[in-house]
Amino acid sequence: MSLHDFTVKSIDGKDFDLSQLKGKKVIVVNVASECGLTPQYENLQELYDQFGGEKFEIIAFPANDFGAQEPGTNEEINGFCSKNYGVSFPVMSKISVIGDDQHEVYQFLTQQAKNGLGDHEMLWNFQKFLVDENGELVRNVPPQTLPIDESIINWINS
């Protein structure tokens, strides 16, 4: 199993086939509009402006699982991201990243039986998962680590 095996819904409700990411390094991140870490959107966009394209992608999944910090509709979330941070990387429809209704992408990212790397507890909003060109999970990055952290930039460039 790999990240490329999934099809998700974009923020505007269209199918987004993750197999289109083959050959790209990807950061998968759960996001929220009313979180103390929400300014990381700016760093994510900086990263996307610098590296996004043929070799790198960011996929954001809004989730209301931590502190009810993403209460908005998909339309409201999309407007917030565009207006406040000029987000141009793909944002998906709001999902759950924990619990009984955990989305299948996050089941893959957090369960060793599915990702082959390890079990990863979801800690908070803006937790980042680094996925290689083959759709394999390579690293789980804590929420407080900025997207422009040297270790992430080095991974993108490697």
Language-model-derived ranges and their functions:
Residues M1-S19, T38-P39, E104:
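N-terminal "domain-start" segment that seeds a small globular fold
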Residues K55-T73, S88-G99:
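Thiol-based oxidoreductase modules, predominantly thioredoxin-like and allied folds used
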Residues Q107, Q111-S158:
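Thiol-/selenol-based redox modules, centered on thioredoxin-like
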Residues N43-E46, E76, E104, F108, ...:
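Alpha-helical elements of Rossmann-like donor-binding domains used by nucleotide-donor carbohydrate transfer enzymes
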Residues K24-V26, E34, T38-N64, N78, ...:
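Conserved helix-turn-beta segment immediately C-terminal to the redox Cys motif
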Residues V31:
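Hydrophobic adenine-recognition pocket in adenosine-nucleotide-binding enzymes
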Residues E75-L123:
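Short, internal strand/loop/helix patches
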